[in-house]
Amino acid sequence: MKIYKDIITGDEMFADTYKMKLVDDVIYEVYGKLITRQGDDIKLEGANASAEEADEGTDITSESGVDVVLNHRLTECFAFGDKKSYTLYLKDYMKKVLAKLEEKSPDQVDIFKTNMNKAMKDILGRFKELQFFTGESMDCDGMVALVEYREINGDSVPVLMFFKHGLEEEKC
């Protein structure tokens, strides 16, 4: 299994256990599912249940959301109220990624520059339909993943988008 981590923050963003596709050699699209998890209170083994207070069965907790977001502890980010603020973030973030690429993978620089401009225009064109998520550290200097809901075979499917060159693969 491969874990994909943000090259700036080191946050775990997703794993290759999900259906995914590489678009224009710069964006990973990861297909998620809406899920609800339920968990009970922790019970100590060997405890005498009759000596405890009566359990009313109402202590079940649940969390709902996109499986990729929940499993990798991504946090929704509300920092981008308009296209202009997101564009400023993208330009700054892309400079950081470009500096890392020039240092570690100079052969990828031209691919990144050429294809990223097209991808950015496409993303900015759909800005109002997107949700934004940071890694567990909630550091907006790192990668901000995008979530868009798309109609696929009659279902609304959450599709997460991650910038390929802003990730490092780690084999587990």
From Swiss-Prot:
Domain TCTP: 1-172
One protein family per Pfam: TCTP
Compartments it resides in: Cytoplasm
Entry superkingdom: Eukaryota
Modified residues (Phosphothreonine): 58, 61
Keywords: Calcium, Cytoplasm, Phosphoprotein
UniProt xrefs under InterPro entries: Mss4-like_sf, Mss4/transl-control_tumour, TCTP, Translation_control_tumour_CS, Translational_control_tumour_p
An example Gene Ontology molecular-function term: guanyl-nucleotide exchange factor activity
GO cellular component: cytoplasm; cytoplasmic microtubule; nucleus; polytene chromosome
Modified positions (Phosphoserine) in chain numbering: 50
UniProt-listed GO biological process terms: cellular response to gamma radiation; double-strand break repair; mitotic G2 DNA damage checkpoint signaling; mitotic intra-S DNA damage checkpoint signaling; positive regulation of cell size; positive regulation of multicellular organism growth; regulation of stem cell differentiation
Matches recorded under Gene3D superfamilies: Metal Binding Protein, Guanine Nucleotide Exchange Factor, Chain A
Signal sequence, start to end: none
Main location class: cytoplasm
Protein family: Belongs to the TCTP family.
Function, in words: Involved in calcium binding and microtubule stabilization.
Protein name from the UniProt record: Translationally-controlled tumor protein homolog
Species this chain originates from: Drosophila melanogaster (Fruit fly)
Recorded name of the encoding gene: Tctp
